[in-house]
Amino acid sequence: MTTREDGRADDELRTVKITRGFTSHPAGSVLVEFGNTRVMCTASVEEGVPRWRKGSGLGWLTAEYAMLPAATHTRSGRESVKGKVGGRTQEISRLIGRSLRACIDLAAIGENTIALDCDVLQADGGTRTAAVTGAYVALVDAVTYLRAADLLSDPQPISCGIAAVSVGVVDGRVRLDLPYEEDSRAEVDMNVVATDTGTLVEIQGTGEGATFPRSTLDKLLDSALAGCEQLFEIQRQALAEPYPGVLPEPKNPEPKKKFGA
């Protein structure tokens, strides 16, 4: 099998690392690394829901994505300074939110909001897929936090795992997990979000420099789903460790029974 510039096989992921408890304040905080792409994903629990959600008894999950100015080779100004959020930033923020809402029962968290913030520290391709994969782990930790605080009506509101990976056609070959060097010249570029139950959440795919047949689409999806299976295992290993911070006490603990009562 032909090797790539970084030495990987076509169907091989970059080295993926997930570090929980990366920062101490949010309920969930993760550093996810796909090779040289590094994204900090946090999950914060906030009381209340958006105005249009009030009175429904349902919670909400929202996401924001951003890149640090020096995340790429050429510094890009902060969008907050420019006073306008770019279209790409909005698109990726919505993708992350949609992807993670697919795995959680929002009725179980009551009228509370889980806010996911994904900040790219260093970009080398696949930032949105790394963000989705890391945000899932941060979300699981946030749910653990809510459970400890006795704020869940269902102790297991997460129904499945969520991971995402990029895949594309480069030099006429289907390749998994594209770094920037490949992504920038791919003939076909695709991002796939999947569940660990074998279903798909979202597919974003375009022919950048060429059209492609249905048979290539099938190969792209097969490669992406195989990659996601590996990511699910990496997530499970990361989550097998204890919660990395201090869990809250229940807000309304049951009164202790008197001895002999």
Curated annotation (Swiss-Prot):
Purpose of the protein: Phosphorolytic 3'-5' exoribonuclease that plays an important role in tRNA 3'-end maturation. Removes nucleotide residues following the 3'-CCA terminus of tRNAs; can also add nucleotides to the ends of RNA molecules by using nucleoside diphosphates as substrates, but this may not be physiologically important. Probably plays a role in initiation of 16S rRNA degradation (leading to ribosome degradation) during starvation.
Keywords attached to this entry: Nucleotidyltransferase, RNA-binding, rRNA processing, Transferase, tRNA processing, tRNA-binding
The family this protein is said to belong to: Belongs to the RNase PH family.
Residues that, per the record, bind phosphate: R88, G126, T127, R128
Protein name, UniProt field: Ribonuclease PH
Lineage: Bacteria, Bacillati, Actinomycetota, Actinomycetes, Mycobacteriales
GO biological process: rRNA catabolic process; rRNA processing; tRNA processing
Sequence ranges of Basic and acidic residues compositional bias: 251-261
NCBIfam families, per database record: RNasePH (TIGR01966)
Pfam families, per the entry: RNase_PH, RNase_PH_C
This enzyme's EC code(s): 2.7.7.56
Source organism of this protein record: Rhodococcus erythropolis (strain PR4 / NBRC 100887)
One Gene Ontology term of the molecular function aspect: tRNA nucleotidyltransferase activity
Database matches in SUPFAM superfamilies: Ribonuclease PH domain 2-like, Ribosomal protein S5 domain 2-like
Residues annotated as signal peptide: none
Catalytic activity, reaction form: tRNA(n+1) + phosphate = tRNA(n) + a ribonucleoside 5'-diphosphate
Subunit: Homohexameric ring arranged as a trimer of dimers.
Annotated stretches, region: Disordered: 242-261
